[in-house]
Amino acid sequence: AGMGMNFGMTLGAMAGQIGLIFAADWQVWGIPGLILAAIISIPISVLLGIMIGKLLNRAKGREMITSYMIAFAMDGVYQFFVLFMMGPVIPIIHNTLKLPRGYGIRNTVSLLNMRQSLDNLLAVSVGGVKIPVLTLIIIAAACLFILWFRRTKLGQDMRAVGQDMEVARDAGINVERTRVISMVISTVFAGFGMIIYLQNVGNFPTYTAHTQIGMFSIAALLVGGASVE
């Protein structure tokens, strides 16, 4: 939608991590834990996506650097909530997640009981190599969703806005609303992606896991042939 690469996807990653923290605290593991984490991350991602979308509407032409700075700023907000609010304000049941002082989340959250839940659910072994069928199905479904979405009115509106905002506005498209929706969708999917990524690893550093994910994701997009538009 003419907003360039979304460095603000880091905010979605933070939402995904918060979902996983609550899933671990409530001892909901495996696929149910992933679903719970995703459900928790959705409203957080939507709110963050609306916020960043409205901010970027005020920074037209400078979206990428603005989203990068927003990600840095929101990192401080995330750390404040996780380090100081979880425990005294936001209830955390299990002390194994808390810092020794009694509040704040430990530096590493273990997801051992959730590790590779997607990969193992429909795994097929071929020549001693485990093929994560369900993970591949999810990736294929995401690709099909993108192909379908590009043919919808909203998808066409986003393409039009990305090509020329003024022409899109003259055509009756609500440019600002379309840009906000694109950021919401991007942030929600970033949260899902972070959840899938971290369940594969089996643990995550609470305060740094999200910091580089935006760079890695955008590098993957560029290597895959995406343009900055």
Task: Describe each region flagged by the PLM.
Residues 184-192, 196-229:
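Transmembrane alpha-helical segments in multi-pass inner-membrane proteins
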